[in-house]
């Protein structure tokens, strides 16, 4: 029976992301006329176990758009938009593959997000309230990627992200103001040493100076923290994205103009953690090396070793990581698995096992701020959404500030 919550139509179409690539937008319209959209982000550094992003040979996403218009829309017509789990299960069954390779995870996640946003509007709820239900909501700590390397930049750094983490602050606003001060200080440092031309931004809004050695990047970020007067309040983080510089034929990591064995990489990270205020380390090894993750985490207990490519937002791999005690943290990327329902199942499994959670963007983003609501709705410990620059990044931070201003939620920084 049709009612005001019934889905009348789902339309897919192509839009442009922050890297100038085409991506998928889905728009869900209800019989009542209420409608909302969801966008599919896209990563540059991808785990091999991620759900499949359908992309045509010419770079378009027409195949994924067709999946929405010719398969997903008819299957969802007439369903109650509030039944997120049922809708996501229908898309999973309609796809029929383990990795969303028939419909495309970019088609299913765009639709899943659009369904959630439309449902929240129809119920008169903020998206984070709709997602989280009765959970007590808090504001996550941002991991701000202020210096870019790896596949996100045009320099020779192998480590992909160098982050600042504003912990010892009472509000998110204070934390972000401190972070923007550090970001501007870093820009000034790079200008002083290399010239203004080298303050060009990477894919995620971070600065990309002409560096090739990890230590030089760490020194720059640490000096920016100290010059800003934030030492002891703001910590450091890295996303190595180590699968991208691992040579499987030789079994070595090609970094800093040399080759390191997996055991040498452990000592490399242990040394960094002993000399810098390192709180967070993501993807330190290639995506299949669960045992080295475990060994490193046991060596640097105060650092949150975090798996992204290791787990790819998939409960099967997270269960393995839990069994092997591979990591204290997990990245949560909805497009890696393809529906919000599966994303939340992964998130809850991590939380149930006292693992820190990081709701994350991708390097190819849009201005859609949905992941800010997702992070707040799920009570994520952290959110990762780039530097405090570029509109597709600041839209998420500004949504968090809007939530803080309107609802007065607690900032998690001092609880970590």
UniProtKB/Swiss-Prot annotation:
GO biological process terms on file: glycolytic process
One Pfam family of this chain: Enolase_C
Keywords from the UniProt entry: Cytoplasm, Glycolysis, Lyase, Magnesium, Metal-binding, Secreted
Residue numbers binding Mg(2+): 239, 282, 308
Gene from which the chain derives: eno
Organism of provenance: Metallosphaera sedula (strain ATCC 51363 / DSM 5348 / JCM 9185 / NBRC 15509 / TH2)
GO MF term list: magnesium ion binding; phosphopyruvate hydratase activity
Annotated localization: Cytoplasm; Secreted; Cell surface
Protein name according to UniProt: Enolase
InterPro entries: Enolase, Enolase-like_C_sf, Enolase-like_N, Enolase_C, Enolase_CS, Enolase_N
